[in-house]
Amino acid sequence: MFTLKKSLLLLFFLGTINLSLCEEERNAEEERRDDPEERDVEVEKRFFPAILRVAAKVGPAVLCAITKKC
């Protein structure tokens, strides 16, 4: 009877630790996913280089058309 209680206690303890670790990991993933500041940074990283490339290609043509010095 004592060995049965001991093994059940061990299983309960290990299960509790496992659930605790899973909950912490899930909370960390939710924080990463729901963080609006991080999402804004990702959007900035994605769109600013594209905007700069388009401006670099179109900019000289626009300046040439405005100043008429080509």
Curated annotation (Swiss-Prot):
Residues 23-44 form a propeptide. Transmembrane segments: none annotated. Disulfide bonds join 64-70. Keywords: Amphibian defense peptide, Antibiotic, Antimicrobial, Cleavage on pair of basic residues, Disulfide bond, Secreted, Signal. It comes from the Eukaryota. The keyword Cytoplasm does not apply. Expressed by the skin glands. One of its GO terms (biological process) is defense response to Gram-negative bacterium. GO terms for cellular component: extracellular region. Belongs to the frog skin active peptide (FSAP) family. Brevinin subfamily. This is Brevinin-1S. It comes from Odorrana schmackeri.
